[in-house]
């Protein structure tokens, strides 16, 4: 988004792969430094970031309808029959295409994983962690749905947004529907919020790595699991994740398909990890499971079955390329 903003202000500027790589590495190093601070400092930063994200989201939801200009040929808001129709950008049937679009939803809704990654660092975790999971999924889902409605009723040409030379659909959409200065203001707010979100992801990932290293799952677990004496946080795990992340960023030089596949692979890995304990609890442990103070009661088993069924359906779907048949080439395979 930062490079897209630069391209908007200077149409002659075209970001190169190495510029994208270096900027991303620079941001990741900043996130690593913040995530290496003491827990109290990180908590304050994340509380500020979470509040900023919620405020920013509601500001954007209000600003977009208020700023959409429209033209003589296009209305400010499109009619519901057009909004609620399926615009299939793949060569698969509409049903499959809709399921393939869930990749964005999966990543958006996966924010609920942070509370259980950080449960060891909060008081009254048996209640605080599940409450945070429910609030994250509920508030994020409803607010995200509201934003999607705003976008759906105002976007002019979806193919132009996706295929824009900016390489950033959100930036392309904003430029398409509103004046440039307002679009840049909203894009800037989004960048700040995304920066805060990225730091939260770094913290959550480092705690997962620390937990696995503590159980001896990695070859270098003896080093990764060390807790810094000054900050009382798993600093080594933070920088181990940072090194792995920088290595993965090298896929940028392999093209958009190569780096884009990370999102599908990451979604598959994350949701398989989430589903394994749900599957074991639902189909093997059953009534022997000892419930905590926060539970789903009689709805636990049917919800667990639905969760497992959803993952079974989505795993192969997330591996599908957007084209098939003679149009499918090795370069387009994930």
Model-derived regions, located:
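C-terminal membrane-solvent junction of multi-pass transporters and transport-like membrane proteins
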Residues: 19, 48, 222-232, 274-333
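Membrane-interface loop-to-helix entry segments
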Residues: 21-79, 110, 133-137, 263-274, ...
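Transmembrane helix-loop junctions in multi-pass membrane proteins
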Residues: 34-39, 182, 244-261, 286-287, ...
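Helix-loop-helix junctions that connect adjacent transmembrane segments
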Residues: 12-19, 51-178, 183
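Lipid-exposed faces of alpha-helical membrane segments in multi-pass integral membrane proteins
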Residues: 22-33, 48, 52-62, 139-146, ...
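Juxtamembrane interfacial secondary-structure elements that flank transmembrane helices
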Residues: 1-10, 62-79, 146-165, 203-220, ...
């Amino acid at each position: 988004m930062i490079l897209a903003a630069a391209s908007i202000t200077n149409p002659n500027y075209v970001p190169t792969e190495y510029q994208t790589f270096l900027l991303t590495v620079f941001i990741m190093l900043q996130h690593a430094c913040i995530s290496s601070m003491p827990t109290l400092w990180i908590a304050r930063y994340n509380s500020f970031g979470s509040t900023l994200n919620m405020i920013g989201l509601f500001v954007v939801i209000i600003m977009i309808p208020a700023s959409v200009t429209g033209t003589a040929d296009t209305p400010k808001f499109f009619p519901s029959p057009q909004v609620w129709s399926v615009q299939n950008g793949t060569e698969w049937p509409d049903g499959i295409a809709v399921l393939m679009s869930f990749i964005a939803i999966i990543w958006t809704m996966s924010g609920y994983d942070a509370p259980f990654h950080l449960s060891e660092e909060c008081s009254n975790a048996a209640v605080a962690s599940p409450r945070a999971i429910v609030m994250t999924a509920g508030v994020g889902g409803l607010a995200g749905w509201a934003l999607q409605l705003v976008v759906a009723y105002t976007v002019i040409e979806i193919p132009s947004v996706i295929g824009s030379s900016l390489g950033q659909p959100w930036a392309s959409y904003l430029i398409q529907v509103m004046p440039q200065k307002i679009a840049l203001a909203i894009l800037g707010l989004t960048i700040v919020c995304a920066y805060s979100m990225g730091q939260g992801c770094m913290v959550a990932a480092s705690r997962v790595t620390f937990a696995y290293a503590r159980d001896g799952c990695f070859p270098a677990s003896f080093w990764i699991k060390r807790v810094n004496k000054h900050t009382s946080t798993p600093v080594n795990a933070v920088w181990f994740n940072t090194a792995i992340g920088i290595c993965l960023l090298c896929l940028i030089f392999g093209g958009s398909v190569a780096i884009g596949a990370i999102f599908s692979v990451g979604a598959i890995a994350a949701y398989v990890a989430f589903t394994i304990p749900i599957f074991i609890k639902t189909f093997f442990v059953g009534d022997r499971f000892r419930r905590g103070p926060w539970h789903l009661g009689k709805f636990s088993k049917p919800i667990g079955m639905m969760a497992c069924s959803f993952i079974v359906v989505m795993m192969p779907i997330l591996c599908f390329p957007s084209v098939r048949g003679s149009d499918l080439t090795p370069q387009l395979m994930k």
